[in-house]
Swiss-Prot record:
Residues 64-141 are annotated as: Domain II. GO terms for molecular function: ATP binding; four-way junction DNA binding; four-way junction helicase activity. The lineage of its organism: Bacteria, Bacillati, Actinomycetota, Actinomycetes, Pseudonocardiales. NCBIfam families: ruvA. It is found in: Cytoplasm. It comes from Saccharopolyspora erythraea (strain ATCC 11635 / DSM 40517 / JCM 4748 / NBRC 13426 / NCIMB 8594 / NRRL 2338). This is Holliday junction branch migration complex subunit RuvA. One of its GO terms (cellular component) is cytoplasm. Its main location: cytoplasm. Homotetramer. Forms an RuvA(8)-RuvB(12)-Holliday junction (HJ) complex. HJ DNA is sandwiched between 2 RuvA tetramers; dsDNA enters through RuvA and exits via RuvB. An RuvB hexamer assembles on each DNA strand where it exits the tetramer. Each RuvB hexamer is contacted by two RuvA subunits (via domain III) on 2 adjacent RuvB subunits; this complex drives branch migration. In the full resolvosome a probable DNA-RuvA(4)-RuvB(12)-RuvC(2) complex forms which resolves the HJ. The keyword Methyltransferase does not apply.
Amino acid sequence: MIASVRGPVLSVGLDHAVIEVGGVGMAVHATPATLAGLRRGEEARLWTSLIVREDSLTLYGFADAEARDLFGLLQTASGVGPRLALATLAVLAPDQLCHALSDGNITTLTQVPGVGKKSAERLILELRDKVGTVAGTAGAGAQAPDRGRVRSEVSEALVGLGFSAKQAEQSVEAVLAADGPVSDTSAVLRKALAALGPKK
């Protein structure tokens, strides 16, 4: 198992980044929030999970071990493969996912594309006991994110995805104004992307 990769970022795409490890460029699939934290030319470390199929080897990367472990946990549920597991973590932060599973929150889980009411009920039934105490400790001691830092990181990520600086700034400001207390970077990025829609 490849537990993590570290090296300079060669490129960042819409759904993956290429990180050079020992002279080899490794394509690592990740969520938009994780990709937003990567900068071309800078060194990065991602916690990874290697999915082996008969015709492919696919590497998935995460900002921390908790997200990587949840990615693996999700795939122990019936009908959940790596794509749906990654989509779930793209929509729900690790602490949100843990709370939704432990509390039986179907509404939160059905925010994920591809997860309907029956699928959400199955996830809760199969994973609630496996989440354990993570839900109660995932966000313990976390500091409130700085509004200026969040604004800057999300704007840079949107520009990197092909939106203009003006579009990025306007969408981020709109999301922050609507949210009131500042959200974390991944939440603001998701809402900004939803507001902007697909890039023309």
